[in-house]
């Protein structure tokens, strides 16, 4: 004879792996060409001078230099540039 009532099942208990998004190199930091600066979904940050954009909207350095964050334009967009 069972001494515990049968437990029900649940349909919860899953979660997706984190995607490690965000800023990888901050303002004033030195970078080498090819270094990833930001991993993002969509263009939260836009590519400025000497910054390339990947097909998943990742921003990366096109040349060696220092990272510079700036807000400009009528819509106050955030741009990331590399200063040599």
Swiss-Prot record:
The keyword Ribosomal protein applies. Pfam families: Ribosomal_L27 (PF01016). Keywords: Ribonucleoprotein, Ribosomal protein. SUPFAM superfamilies: Ribosomal L27 protein-like. InterPro entries: Ribosomal_bL27, Ribosomal_bL27_CS. It comes from the Bacteria. One of its GO terms (cellular component) is cytosolic large ribosomal subunit. GO terms for molecular function: structural constituent of ribosome. One of its GO terms (biological process) is translation. PROSITE patterns: RIBOSOMAL_L27. Residues 1-22 are annotated as: Disordered. Belongs to the bacterial ribosomal protein bL27 family. This is Large ribosomal subunit protein bL27. It comes from Shewanella denitrificans (strain OS217 / ATCC BAA-1090 / DSM 15013). The gene is rpmA.
